[in-house]
Regions:
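Generic beta-sheet signal
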Residues: 4, 144-152
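Loop-to-helix element that buttresses phosphate recognition and phosphoryl-transfer chemistry
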Residues: 4-62, 125-135
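General small-molecule cofactor/ligand-binding pocket signal
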Residues: 5, 72-74, 197
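Active-site metal-binding loops of divalent metal-dependent hydrolases
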Residues: 10, 154, 200-202
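Phosphate-coordination/substrate-recognition cap region in phosphate-metabolizing enzymes
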Residues: 35-109
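Glycine-rich phosphate-binding loop signature in dinucleotide/nucleotide-binding domains
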Residues: 42-45, 141-146
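Acidic, low-complexity terminal tails and accessory targeting/binding regions
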Residues: 78-100, 144-147, 162-217
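Internal catalytic-core helix/loop-beta-alpha segment
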Residues: 109-144
Length: 217
């Protein structure tokens, strides 16, 4: 039985209209990661950190400041292509890309339902391909020695949680919308069975004066 720690990246460029504009940490995102790194320095250290290959995931790892822990990247931990899926939904079903937080909350289940049902343009990664690659990343990490942390994104973490709990798309959407920036999640692999043992911990943001840093962007 192997336990893996997954961390969502810090706050990125909220309000961005495309992946390239979104994919870097805000000043607050760097601060969130620094605070989390301070917590990790006080507990049993990780033996290795593996992040996705996206800029926001790499910057989160770097800003945690755990310089004595080896860091490598695995693109299988990259986020799903939400902007691409949203554009596919617009083209195929005429559903416009949301411009507000409220509209986004309604848009997510529409995107995930279309994606899971295969109603997306052919150039996009399928839902099954996405699940296969992120589970492959977990199995790879589980085969390494020591305590391993994985720095990834909302879609990856919410999907793993949904797989472990056997959730449908509607319930998965609720998870997707509640994965806080730099939150900490834990999963155990028992053979091929995935079990979630912790969801959404924020030990570095519990103080009252850090309430402003509890973000989802």
């Amino acid at each position: 039985m192997v336990e893996l720690t997954l961390i969502r990246h810090g706050q990125a460029q909220t309000g961005a209209k495309d992946e390239a504009s979104y994919d870097s940490l805000s000043d607050l995102g760097h601060q969130q990661a620094r605070w989390l790194g301070e917590v990790f320095q006080e507990v049993e250290p990780f033996d290795q950190i593996i992040s996705g290959a996206m800029t926001r995931q790499i910057e989160t790892t770097q800003s945690m400041g755990l310089t004595n822990v080896p860091h490598s990247t695995d693109a299988r931990l990259n986020e799903l292509d939400y902007f691409g899926l949203a554009e596919s939904l617009r083209v195929r079903q005429g559903i416009e890309v949301p411009r507000s937080i409220q509209a986004f909350a309604l848009h997510v289940p529409q995107v995930l339902e279309a994606w899971r049902g295969g109603d997306v343009t052919e150039n996009l990664e399928s839902y099954d391909e996405f699940c296969s690659r992120i589970m492959g990343a977990l199995h790879n990490a589980a085969g390494l020695d020591g305590r391993i942390a994985l720095v990834s994104s909302t879609g990856v973490i919410a999907t793993l949680a949904a797989i472990s709990l056997g959730l449908d798309t509607v319930k998965k959407t609720k998870l997707f919308l509640r994965v806080m920036n730099t939150s900490v999640h834990k999963f155990q692999l028992v053979g091929n069975d995935l079990h979630m043992t912790q969801f959404g911990a924020i030990p570095h943001l519990e103080q009252a004066d850090r309430a402003h840093a509890r973000t989802y962007g």
